[in-house]
Swiss-Prot record:
Enzyme class: hydrolase
Alphabetically ordered keywords of this record: Histidine metabolism, Hydrolase, Manganese, Metal-binding
Name of protein: Formimidoylglutamase
Positions that bind Mn(2+) 1: H130, D156, D160, C245
Catalyzed chemical reaction(s): N-formimidoyl-L-glutamate + H2O = formamide + L-glutamate
UniProt entry tagged with the keyword Hydrolase: yes
NCBIfam families: hutG
Pathway(s) it belongs to: Amino-acid degradation; L-histidine degradation into L-glutamate; L-glutamate from N-formimidoyl-L-glutamate (hydrolase route): step 1/1
Function, as annotated: Catalyzes the conversion of N-formimidoyl-L-glutamate to L-glutamate and formamide.
GO molecular function: agmatinase activity; formimidoylglutamase activity; manganese ion binding
Gene responsible for this protein: hutG
Similarity comment: family membership: Belongs to the arginase family.
Binding positions (Mn(2+) 2): D156, H158, C245, D247
């Protein structure tokens, strides 16, 4: 179900009502219904929320990520508006998963993402469980030529290649995509070595998934080769889709997730990867998933997630912000 965002989600500190240099995001982000979205000459980005954690429930995880989109909006609200006057950010609302109808909600999200991309807007999806990604992918695939090569880059502790014979979940979507679309490749960074059975790593090799284990990313010497690999991967694809699962981070930095990672990545490492990918000219959309406010401590997962979203918006809009 599609709904508009409540105005109360965009509120915060006001330092000035006239000096643009003192504005914050809640003073500039415009709420616009999907029916009223039009293509613009302005360089623009659109935010869409996916209020759903049905995939997490099906995957036997801890629910609560459905509250992530509005929590992230609140985290973004008081961040400084540093974009150029000709740039715009709009909030087009939410897709809500009702009555456990995950597949229907994913199709609805895909329709929104496709429309936004076809209107030449950069797209940021606020999840939701990581089942958010499948709807994001559906929208990208519908917006570009059928034979265009999509390169998915996922920053995540998990491979998400579980079987979907019985039903899809937050752990199946990449297997769904790779088995259904011959024009997609999949590159995962941050995988937890102790988080998966040998069978799932074997499935990753069978599907020719590129992946980097978390403990191969612990030193600065390892990061530059990864940046080089990402650059080559992005250059080889027509469209790059970036998805971030917050459980990739060390649990001390991001406790508010369904499956926290004791050996997770440091925020600065994730930021470096995010900057690299969202600055590439083939990247036009980004999603952030698994922010669970009910499991958070002092709001630090939400705040970190909001900073990552801001970083993505800044780079997708051409790096005009701070």
């Amino acid at each position: 179900m599609y709904t508009m965002t409540d105005q109360k989600q965009w509120k915060g500190r006001i330092d000035s009502t006239t000096n643009r240099s003192s504005f914050r995001l809640h003073q500039q982000v415009k709420r616009i219904a999907m029916n009223d979205v039009s293509a613009s000459d302005k360089k623009g980005a659109a935010i869409i929320g996916f209020i759903c954690d049905e995939g997490v429930r099906r995957n036997q995880g801890r629910v609560g990520a459905a509250n992530g989109p509005n929590a992230l909006r609140e985290g973004l609200s008081s961040l400084p508006w540093t974009f150029e006057e000709e740039q715009q950010i709009i909030d087009v609302g939410n897709i809500i998963c009702l009555n456990h109808a995950l597949e229907e909600a994913q199709r609805e999200l895909g329709d929104v993402v496709s429309t936004l991309l076809q209107k030449k807007l950069q797209c940021v999806v606020l999840g939701g469980g990581h089942e958010t990604l499948y709807g994001h992918y559906l929208g990208v695939r519908a917006a570009i030529p059928k034979d265009a090569k999509i390169g998915i880059i996922k920053i995540d502790a998990h491979i998400d290649l579980r079987p979907y014979d019985e039903q899809p979940s937050s752990g199946t979507m990449f297997r769904q995509i790779l088995e259904q679309d011959p024009h997609v490749d999949y590159f995962v960074v941050g995988i937890q070595r102790y988080g998966y059975t040998k069978e799932l790593f074997e499935k990753a090799d069978e599907l020719q998934v590129k992946y980097v284990i978390e403990d191969d990313m612990t030193s600065a010497a390892n990061i530059q080769p990864l940046m080089d690999d990402l650059q080559h991967y992005m250059d080889q694809h027509d469209y790059v889709l970036l998805t971030l699962c917050m459980d990739v981070l060390n649990a001390a930095a991001a406790p508010g997730v369904s499956a926290p990672s004791p050996f997770g990545l440091e925020p600065t490492t994730v930021r470096t990867i995010l900057q690299k990918v969202t600055s590439h000219p083939h990247t036009h959309s980004f999603d952030i998933c698994e922010v669970n406010p009910s499991l958070d401590e002092n709001g630090r997962t939400v705040k970190l997630g909001a900073y990552f979203v801001y970083e993505a918006l800044n780079n997708l809009l051409g790096g005009q912000g701070l």
